[in-house]
Amino acid sequence: MQRMRNGSSATSPGIVQYTTEVLFLDLWLRPDLAPRDRSLVTVSALFASGQVAQITYHLNRAMDNALTQEQAGEVITHLAFYAGWPNAFSALPLVKDVFEKRPH
């Protein structure tokens, strides 16, 4: 989140404010979905919409929130059928990189 603040605050302070106050300090803290589930939904939405630039950050957060490598791999397989094979293959190098850089 600090990287987002540093890179965007001068360009669009409003987006930083809404991201911090509404997205992270409200939506992500609502009690009806666990952080792992919210992370899984977020990664799936990014994957399905082809927004691969954000996958690394959010997949790391999902794994911080207890998503395993095996589960992440299964999510990609499942989403390939619903969101398209090109999206799956676009995301695979990023997912592989996340897996390799995380402690085992």
PLM-predicted stretches and their roles:
Residues D37-L46, V75-I76:
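Short, structured motif recognition centered on aromatic/hydrophobic residues
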Residues A80-P86:
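C-terminal structural segments of small proteins and small subunits
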